[in-house]
Design a protein with these regions (language model features):
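Active-site beta-strand/loop microenvironment that shapes enzyme catalytic pockets
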Residues: 199-241
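Compact, glycine/acidic-enriched structural inserts
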Residues: 168-194, 257-282
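C-terminal catalytic or substrate-handling cores of phosphate/nucleotide-
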Residues: 269-318
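Short, glycine-/Ser/Thr-/acidic-enriched flexible segments
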Residues: 56-58, 159, 225, 234, ...
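Short conserved micro-motifs at the rims of enzyme active sites and ligand-binding pockets
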Residues: 61-64, 165-166, 255-260, 303-307
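Short beta-strand segments
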Residues: 155, 220-221, 246
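N-terminal extension/subdomain marker
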Residues: 1-185, 193-195, 207-209, 215
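Catalytic or ion-translocation cores adjacent to nucleophile or general acid/base/metal-coordination motifs
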Residues: 224-276
Length: 318
């Protein structure tokens, strides 16, 4: 039997976990007040906030902030802030702020099984075009870091619910590792240690999914660029071969997929659309054309363009 997903040695803070746990560093990038409130909540307590670099601060010179992060990591390791959960896989039960419950499994994947290249047939694949220019700054931030705080979610296509969901049937028999409220009205989360004998069952179920999905097992649902950076660090011999991730079923009822819109206010619709078409090289009707519907007031206008962007989302709503 192949092993696609493994237990890990996981560091768990022994402090107030509500103040320890913060949202992913790439969130609230246009709301510095959110991060200011987080700093106020954390105060002088040990916190993940002090060993990550929120992207809201990326515009300036961050060398001093990065040095401080590295010092904090060293201090936390030396001052017994963590306990080590050896050879552990965790069942996570997250209650979102809207009341929905999301189930996941935290464990290790092998970066040799992952590729962000377009057209890859790897076991683990990206779900959006990777902007390679985003990788070097992230590599620089991680260069001297002795701890990793990942926020990567891998999705499995498991309509029969054979991997994650069966674990919840026996959760009362599992050792509870944590149970706490997340700050800033973000819901709550519980974590349970998955028994060693159950890990083999998880991998057997994953092997079946792999065979049913033509070799594709995991799709990166969140953290595409984080995982790409981890792969780049590994390739450059400056990082681990393995990455800590959470595996979630794409059929989990808590997951809702919605389009991302860009809204422009205070502009003449046709003037803006004409400028957009011109910037994209004019109308294009080729087989690889992107079709856009621009909506404004009670009207709409359809345009067809040859996309220059490597991003998955490129919609304009007026």
């Amino acid at each position: 039997m192949e092993k696609f997903f493994s237990p890990a040695d996981i560091l768990l803070a022994k402090t107030d976990l509500t103040k320890w746990s913060v949202i992913a560093c790439d969130q609230y990038t246009s709301e510095p007040e959110y991060w200011a409130e987080t700093e106020k909540t954390v105060g002088d307590n040990p916190s993940a906030l002090k060993i990550v670099l929120p992207e809201v601060y990326l515009s300036g010179d961050n060398s001093q902030r990065i040095n401080e992060i590295n010092r904090n990591m060293k201090e936390y390791l030396e001052s017994d802030v963590f306990e080590t959960l050896q050879n552990t896989m965790i069942l996570t039960l997250r209650t979102l702020k809207n009341g929905a419950d999301r189930k996941g499994i935290v464990g290790l994947i092998d970066l040799e099984d992952y590729s962000y290249e377009k057209g890859s047939d790897a076991l683990i694949r990206a779900t959006e075009a990777t902007v390679v220019e985003r990788i070097p700054p992230r590599v620089e931030i991680r260069k001297d870091a002795i701890l990793e705080m990942p926020h990567v979610m891998l999705l499995i296509n498991d309509p029969k619910k054979t991997v994650v969901e069966p674990l919840t049937l026996n959760v009362e028999d599992y050792e509870k590792l944590y149970d706490f409220t997340l700050m800033q009205n973000a819901g709550s989360v519980k974590g349970y240690k998955i028994p060693d004998e159950t890990v083999a069952e998880i991998n057997r179920a994953l092997e079946t999914l792999k065979n049913e999905n033509d070799g594709l097992l995991f799709a990166v649902g969140d953290g595409n660029h984080s995982l790409a950076t981890a792969k780049e660090c590994y390739k450059n011999h400056n990082g681990s071969r393995y990455a800590l991730v959470e595996v979630v079923n794409i059929h989990d009822s808590s997951l809702e997929f919605e389009p991302i819109y860009r809204t422009v206010f205070g502009a003449d619709p046709n003037t803006l659309i004409n400028a957009f078409v011109e910037a994209m090289g004019g109308e294009y009707e080729g087989a690889d054309a992107y079709k856009y519907t621009c909506v404004f007031g009670a009207g709409e206008r359809k345009i067809s363009l040859k996309a220059k962007s490597r991003l998955a989302v490129a919609d304009l709503q007026i």
